[in-house]
C-alpha cells in the first residue's frame, strides 16, 4: 500500500502544471516491476520491452481497455505526452 501511495504521488499533475520528471516516474515502476524491470510472479516484466509497446500498454490501462488491479489507477492521470516520456525512459533503462 505504501508503494501505491508513492506511485500515486508521482503521477501526472493537473492540467496546466509542469510535467513530472520521466526518470522519477520510471523509478516508481520498479516498486512492482523490479529494479531492472524483471518482474517477480505474475506482474508483467518491462525488461526488454520497446517504447511503443510500453506506451500502448499504459494507454490501454488508462483508457480502461486492458483489465488490471493497480495499473488503471496509476495510468489514469497521465496525458499522452507523459506516457510517451515514461515509456521512452523505461525502454532505455531496461533494455
Residue ranges and their predicted role:
Residues 1-2:
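Bacterial N-terminal signal peptides that target proteins for export
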Residues 7-27, 42-44, 55, 60, ...:
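Electrostatic cytochrome c docking/interface patches
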Residues 21-22, 36-66, 72-76:
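Gly/Gly-Pro-rich "capping" loops immediately C-terminal to redox-active cysteine motifs
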Residues 27-36, 86:
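The canonical Cys-X-X-Cys-His
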Residues 34, 63, 91-95:
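Residues at helix-coil transition
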Residues 76-95:
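C-terminal capping alpha-helices of c-type cytochrome domains
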Amino acid at each position: 500500500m505504501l508503494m501505491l501511495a508513492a506511485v500515486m504521488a508521482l503521477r501526472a499533475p493537473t492540467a496546466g502544471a509542469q510535467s513530472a520528471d520521466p526518470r522519477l516516474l520510471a523509478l516508481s515502476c520498479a516498486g512492482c516491476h523490479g529494479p531492472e524491470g524483471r518482474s517477480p510472479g505474475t506482474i508483467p516484466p518491462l525488461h526488454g520491452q520497446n517504447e511503443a509497446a510500453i506506451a500502448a500498454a499504459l494507454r490501454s490501462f488508462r483508457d480502461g481497455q486492458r483489465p488490471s488491479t493497480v495499473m488503471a489507477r496509476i495510468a489514469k492521470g497521465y496525458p499522452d505526452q507523459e506516457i510517451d516520456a515514461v515509456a521512452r525512459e523505461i525502454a532505455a533503462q531496461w533494455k
